[in-house]
């Protein structure tokens, strides 16, 4: 079935063997907990990623750039060039540091113009001092939100507790309430379910037409029962499937969705249709 649906992954990153040593110390313990320490140590090649997509029945991924404290594990330029080279397989999500002010603002604009970027990826835990992050309603984000609304691209934010040894309080979903009220034209997704505050994230997505819940880094087998029911009923139009590849594999996350027993239409929305609409991939 997954091959027919043609899944779209809302959050994945390619960290090549040449860049795998750049992961900061605060991340390695979570790679061990997920049982993928060696995967991250070795990195992945583009060919490996494409093969794994094919084997899992994943048609396309939102290929996210990832930069942490200046270390470009996958730069906007790298992600953008891959998206241009393989437009049927990748759409690009750029990333910027909102602390960089107008430099970040213009970088978003560049990525849209040069690479047809479809989303901005933000990780609030990264924009602080390592103990306190910057919640999504911090006004330093607002020029970026305005630019994304103007350019008609989405914003996907890491919401919930962090896996890395970095601050989590800034990931409370309620901070998105103010953002959604201020920018009703902006398409917003809270990534990683927002756990352990997933009930709040689910309610925000139900409340606001422009807010969605994204599932990356959370294996479907372990999704809370309330979220499984949400995907099958009252929230089925507001959920985006993702992996946070290579943290979770494409095949595992597709297969485990298959095992949830969702209605076919709900499953199709989760794996593909909602992402097509949210990221405007058919435009």
Where do the model's predicted regions map?
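Active-site-adjacent C-terminal substructures of enzyme catalytic domains
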Residues: 187, 194-252, 260-265
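Active-site gating/metal-coordination segments in enzymes
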Residues: 59-60, 69-157, 161-163, 167-170, ...
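Short aromatic-enriched loop/helix-cap "lid" or pocket-rim segments at secondary-structure transitions
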Residues: 18-24, 75-76, 105-106, 132-134, ...
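Hydrophobic faces of well-ordered beta-strands that scaffold small-molecule active sites
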Residues: 8-12, 61-63, 91-94, 120-122, ...
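Amphipathic, non-transmembrane alpha-helical secondary structure
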Residues: 46-54, 73-80, 84, 102-113, ...
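Mid-to-C-terminal alpha-helical segments outside catalytic/metal-binding sites
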Residues: 2-60, 110, 233-240, 248-283
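Active-site acidic short loop of glycosyltransferases
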Residues: 58, 88, 150, 185, ...
